[in-house]
A protein has these predicted regions:
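A generic structural signal for short beta-strands and their flanking turns/coil linkers
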Residues: 25, 43, 88-90, 225, ...
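Contiguous mid-protein beta-loop-alpha structural module that forms a pocket-lining wall or clamp
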Residues: 163-168
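A short beta-sheet element
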Residues: 30-31, 54-112, 230, 254-313, ...
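Non-catalytic DNA-recognition/assembly elements of restriction-modification systems
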Residues: 1-13, 139-155, 169-212, 342, ...
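Short coil/turn segments at secondary-structure boundaries
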Residues: 17-24, 122-123, 194-197, 215-221, ...
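A short glycine-rich beta-alpha junction/loop motif
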Residues: 85-92, 102-105, 125-148, 287-295, ...
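Periplasmic-binding protein-like
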Residues: 116-119, 317-320
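Sequence-specific dsDNA recognition surfaces
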Residues: 5-18, 32-64, 202-218, 232-264
Length: 390
């Protein structure tokens, strides 16, 4: 065992002023850029190259960056593509002193482990916002194996990481296949490029059902006890039954609000970007209820639920959904039942909708196989990380 500060230099960042950001120069790596395992920088900010603090807080390729505020303990490896770069405040840079004694890949896997992140959370101070001390990082003890053992550990975890990436890419490609097939069969739904008839959504529905409001625990339910779905069970367009909260009094269970296989659930309230997302329930455990932030869309014989699900969530149609929402750009947006019923949608022949739904079902079966493989890999990685690092 060795202290992290004995094998690494631990450097703090600088409070670069946002009013001096430029559109080019040296990239400033902020705490928001440091995600678990990677750097996220879709909206980069820069500082003038000749600024003295830029030179003082300059980062190097393969530096390990650790978040010190909020979600503390997230660790990312700085790749060459992000250089030149400088370190902002509340991010620590961990830089190996002797790379021939500790491998950067080994140290990255160690610091990117769930165990290390949990230890950071425990050590962090603050109520409203957690803060981690660089001094604690210096004192944190890490296992140091022989170089041969470090290589073995790194190679094993690298191989699993690669397989995990490949499985995620497979899932993304299957999703893209469905989106592409939708456009091929039905055109661009935002401008009805294939000229299908329009109908108000109300003409395709038997009813829109509301969920219920309950006093809940913050914890997920145990076994199959009654629970209410969280908004996140539907938010991203795929039904997630584990996103639920136990209700405090099981006698308050409302049968009419229970979710069933074949339901089409719609988020009536969310952020402006995510409001109006839809999820089809391929299967579900019993005793899960809809919250009052979710509608259930009960369709009639004019429309296939799976077609409607993919239409509502399609990137080319999202603008129309967001246009019927009310609320300011900075607040939660809301879609009323009345506005939803008036939404104009394309209505292709039912046989085309059914053909498309059959494709979606086949693709979902393939996704399920890939997802199961992904989950096994993630469990394997978690077990190995526990074995190697605690």
């Amino acid at each position: 065992m060795a202290k992290l500060g004995e094998v690494c230099d631990i450097l703090n960042g600088y409070a670069f002023k946002s009013n001096q950001y430029t559109t080019s120069g040296v990239r400033i790596i902020r705490i928001s850029n440091v995600q678990k395992g990677y750097i996220e920088d879709k909206s980069p900010v820069y500082y003038p190259c000749d600024d003295e603090n830029v030179k003082k807080y300059e980062l190097k390729q393969n530096d390990l960056l650790i978040s010190l505020t909020g979600n503390v303990g997230r660790t990312a490896l700085l790749e060459e593509k992000f250089l030149p770069a400088a370190l902002n405040q509340r991010v620590s840079c961990v830089r190996l002193k002797e790379p021939d004694k500790v491998l950067k890949t080994y140290l990255f896997h160690l610091l990117n482990s769930d165990y290390f992140e949990q230890q950071c959370m425990k050590a962090a101070e603050g109520v409203a916002q957690k803060n981690l001390s660089p001094k604690w990082l210096f004192e944190y003890k890490i296992p140091i194996y022989s170089i041969e053992r470090q290589k073995e550990i790194s190679n094993t975890l690298d191989k699993i990481d690669l397989l995990i990436i490949l499985r995620k890419q497979q899932l993304a490609k299957l999703d893209e296949l469905v989106k592409a097939r939708f456009v091929e069969m039905f055109g661009n739904p935002s401008n009805n490029s294939l000229g299908f008839p329009y109908e108000p959504l109300s003409n395709c529905l038997l009813s829109i059902e509301n969920g219920k409001s309950f006093v809940c625990s913050n914890d997920m339910r145990q076994e199959e006890n009654p629970a209410i779905l969280k908004l996140s069970a539907v938010t991203y367009g795929v039904y997630q039954q584990d996103e639920n909260k136990a209700i405090l009094d099981s006698s308050m269970f409302v049968k009419s609000a229970e979710v069933h296989k074949g339901d089409l659930l719609f988020t009536r309230k969310n952020t402006p970007e995510l409001v109006g997302m839809c999820a089809y329930v391929n299967d579900t455990a019993p005793n899960l209820m809809m919250p009052d932030l979710i509608f259930r869309l009960n369709t009639n014989e004019k429309i296939n639920k799976i077609f409607l699900w993919k239409l509502i969530n399609h990137e080319f149609f999202r603008g129309k959904i967001q246009n019927i929402a009310t609320g300011s750009a900075k607040s939660m947006s809301n879609i009323s039942k009345e506005r939803l019923e008036k939404l104009a949608i394309i209505l292709p022949p039912l046989h085309l909708q059914n053909d498309f739904a059959t494709l979606v079902e086949r693709v979902d079966q393939q996704k399920q196989t890939v997802q199961q493989s992904l989950e096994k890999l993630e469990l394997m990685k978690k077990a190995l990380m526990q074995e190697y690092f605690g």
